[in-house]
Amino acid sequence: MPAQTVGAAETAGQGVTINVYNWGEYIANGTDGSLDINAEFTRRTGIRVNYTTFDSNEALYSKLVGGGADYDIIIPSDYMVSRLIHENMLAELDFSNIPNYQYIDDSFRNADYDPENRFSVPYTWGVVGLFYNTDYIEEEITSWSSLWDDRYAGKILMFDNPRDSFAIAQLLLGQSLNTVEESDWLEAAALLKQQKPLVQAYVMDRIFDKMESEEAWIAPYYSGDAAILVDNSDNIRFVVPKEGTNYFVDAMCIPATSSHKAEAEAYINFLCDPEIAGANMDYVGYSTPETAAKAYMDPEMVESPVHYPDEEILARTQVFVNLPENTGKLIDKLWAEAKMGGPGESAVLVAIILGFLAVYIAILVYKRRKRKRELA
């Protein structure tokens, strides 16, 4: 059946503007000879796109719960989709407006994060790995422990979000990425605190730029973005460490507060057109959940083990799930401490501040008493 790119909902929505909130560098935009996806959608449907970006699932969640923004399309990762469903923050999709959903592979349907397949449509998938510069790191990297190697001090980057950073420590410790045991999270946090002095920066989208400019030598990153740099560099290598990694799916969803649900569904349908999906994935570098889209993609990308890891690698992956609220609060607390170097450092800082304050108060008291004596 041919793809359907213009439907009744799209035609009815001409003149409407939808607000799309997506990850940075996560859609073809007309640069480097790519198709401008949003412009093409507007050309075909008359529906305009106001497109803004975020750099972590947690930033997306904070923006949604904080209010003040009316989004029609968001693209969270699997575990965040589950959380948003649980908190009644997503609209149920009308799949009669998304006929191109037929092209989504069966293996991506009825996923654990959306078991009834009511609230999301897969956009991309990938894995997390390590990429490093072979001009500065000559030995072959095989383990996440390389991010704790003091030979690379000041040249190591880490994710600036808790789930991804904790996952690296958890994999080294042999833990489940979805443990709810407080002792596990404390152990992982201790490992991250040990790493802190070696880390140049905690960043997200800037990982790519820092690695490209050789400001950093080694960093964890998502396979799609890493693949772009690997494909365009002779000295950048990407590896999935032996301890395993996180496998993720990012999915298109509509917030329950959307003002233009039918037009948003038209946008999802457009992105599911195999030809559009192929052109899009060619640019963003991530893996498509549509086998049909591969016919429109660069054959080298389709055959690349970075873009499409083999079964041996996939067998060593874990998928994030939404964690209980109390575990989430613990993670946030431990993450803040880990980035500061732990409560030990913050306690020293507090002690110093209190010490200065005590001296300042003592001086004020002394001056006041001295003045009283002089007046007497």
Kindly label every feature range from the protein language model:
Residues 10-83:
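Early extracytoplasmic/lumenal segment of secretory-pathway proteins
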Residues 85-92, 114-118, 228-240, 301-305:
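Ligand-binding "clamshell"
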Residues 157-161, 165, 169, 177-241:
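Ligand-binding pocket segment of bilobal, Venus flytrap-like solute-binding proteins
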Residues 255-316, 360:
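Mature extracytoplasmic/periplasmic domains
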